[in-house]
Amino acid sequence: TNIFGADTPAGDYLEGLYFAADAGVKTVAFVYAKTDFGEDLAAASKRKMEERGLQLVLIEGYPPEQRDFAALAKRLGEVNADLIFGVSYLDDSIALVRALKKEGVNPKMLGFTVGPGLREFANQLGADAEGVLGVVQWLRSSREPGAQDFAYRFAQRYGYNPGVYAVMGYSAGQILESAIRLAGTTDHDAVREQLRTMYFRALIGPYNVNETGRQQGRRNFVLQWQDNQRRLVAPEQVAERPLIYPLRATP
C-alpha cells in the first residue's frame, strides 16, 4: 500500500468508551448523523458493544443537517438507556442535549463524538454541558510528549489553540520525516518500507500500522466536562479526574 493512517480508524474510534461497562452501564441508545463517518462508527460500535455485553436498546440515524430532535429525544426517554451516545458534530450535539433536557431525559451517562471536545460546546450549553462525555483523538493535557509545547507555540504563532486537525497535520510530517531518516534516502520504496514497519511516537500518539496501512498503535481518549473544564477520564494512564457516574439528574 501507499497509504498509511496516522489517526484512529472509524472501527476503533470509540474503543475508549467501552469502559462504560465497567462503570455499570447495561443498556445503550446509539444515535448518529448519517454520514460515512457516522455509519461506519454505528456498524463497528454495534458489534463491539454487544461483544462486551452491552445491550443496544436503540440505534437510529438522522440527517446530518437535522436540528429538531424533539421526536428523537422522546424516543430516547422511552427506551430509558443507561448510556445515550451520539456520533455527531458540534451543532447537532448541542441541539440534542437541549432536546433531551427539554424532554426531561436524564441518562446515567451521556456522550458524543466531536462536539464535547470543543470549547464552544460548553460556551453554548452552560451548566447543561456538565458531565457530558466526549471522545477525542488529542488534548494538550493528554501527557503525550510535546503536547504542551506544541499547544503553546501554536497559540503564540496563530493566536488560538490548536485543534486535532492541526495536530494530525503536524504528526503526519513527523512520521514522514522519521521514515525518511530511517531509510536514509527519499527513495519511494525505501520510505514506504519504513512507514510499513516502523514504530514511532508522534505528537498525536503512537504510530504503528498493519499490513494494509491501517493504524493500530493508538487509541482515543475520553473527556468529561467537569466544573466547566474538559477533563480526561479514560484511559486510566491519562485520566486527570475520576469519572462522574451516574450523572446527576437536572430539571
Language model segments and positions:
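Extracytosolic ligand-binding ectodomains
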Residues: 1-251
